[in-house]
Structures are given as C-alpha cells and as structure tokens.
Amino acid sequence: MKNIVIIGGTKGIGKAIVSEVVDNNNVVCLSRNQTDFNHDNYTFHKFDALVDDYPDFDSVDCLIYCPGSINLKPISTLSLDDFRNDFELNVIGAVRAVKKYLNLLKKSESASILLFSTVATKLGMPYHASVSVAKSGIDGLVKTLGSELAPKVRINAIAPTITNTELASKILRNDKVIENMVERHPLKKILSSNEVAKMASFLISEDASSISGQIFNMDAGIVSFKS
C-alpha cells in the first residue's frame, strides 16, 4: 500500500481520485470541505491550501495537488489580484506542498507527484488569461522538477479540457451550452472526473515508472484535432 496525500480531494476530480485509489492505498485528504465519505484507508484533515501549514506525516509515497480555478474574464476586467490569486492557488500552493513533503518522497521506493494543468495553456482561448498564466507555471514546474528530482521522484501533470464537475457548473449551466461544448470537441463528449481519476491512478502507479516530466492532455481532441 502506498501512502498518498491528496490536496483538494473532496470535490470534482480530487474526489474521484480518492474513490479510485482508496481501496488499495492509504489516502490522506487535505481539504477545506469535509464530506461523509468513509473508508478504513481514508483520513481527512481540514485544510486551506492558501493559508494553513501543511501537516506532518511519517511517510509519503505520492503527492497529488488538485486545487484549481476557472476565473474566466476578458483582460479588461481582470484585476492584478485575479492574476495573483490564481497564481497563489495553482502554483504557490503546489510548490508549498512539494517543498513540505519532498524529503519524505525521496525516502520512498516509489515516489511520484501529480499536478493539474489545463488545455488552455496549449490552445488560445478567450477569457482564459489568468488561469492560463497560472497553469503555464504548473507546466514549467513539472518539466523542471522532472529533471531535478530524477531518479528518486517522478512528477507529471494532467491537462484536462472542461470536465463535468462542480467547478465547471457555471459554464455548463444548461443543456444548450453543454450541447455546444460537446460539438466543439472532435470526440463529441465532455470529460468526466472518473476518466481523469483513472489516468491519475495510472500515473502514480508502477505501470508508469518510466514516465516523468510530462503533461498529458485529456482534451477530447480539442488541442490535437481540427473539428
């Protein structure tokens, strides 16, 4: 059993990852919101990634940082604080987690880190300036740390397209919007959190032991194909 620390594991993609990996691993979830999820292998710590000190643990084999934001505004209405806040949540929060648990990860026989990017760093999309800047920082972090931490610690990121989660509910607000979003993607679908969770489970497993420093698009074809 691996000891997995998941930050932001009570909603959306993070919650789906917890459900995907908890049967065969010890999972510690750090999140602001507690749920009624219960499992012998699951421990919850109330935690705010922006302000709280990361708790101490005896061992960490895998670190997964899930917090993100969808702050979509035209550049004319985005404030500097919007950029700062998105960068703090997406990048600084992840850096704090890595720095806190890096020594424990280096002691593991099978250490890995998983972060989250977005397809908006690969594809020019209106109103995505703030989140794209922040997630581009994640892309750079993964590439740099992939080189720096090898061979002891692997690090990768998943870059999803819009995913059917609570975070995206304001965008996927009615059937017409959902239909249009489906049509924009060459594979004619919207990504589910369970699909992302299965990819996450693979990337932290021994089956992915040769993979590090990579950002994996889960994009339903929107980045790679012309629809």
Summary of predicted features, one role per range:
Residues 10, 14, 18:
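N-terminal Rossmann NAD(P)H-binding glycine-rich loop of SDR-like oxidoreductase domains
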Residues 74-75, 82-87, 178-181:
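Substrate-binding pocket helix/loop in short-chain dehydrogenase/reductase
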Residues 201, 212-227:
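Short C-terminal tail/terminal secondary-structure segment
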Residues 98, 134:
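Active-site helix of classical SDR
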Residues 78, 124-132, 144:
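Active-site loop-to-helix junction immediately N-terminal to the catalytic Tyr of the SDR YXXXK motif
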Residues 118:
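Residue(s) in the substrate-gating loop at a strand-loop-helix junction
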Residues 103, 146-151, 209:
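Alpha-helical segment proximal to the catalytic Tyr-Lys
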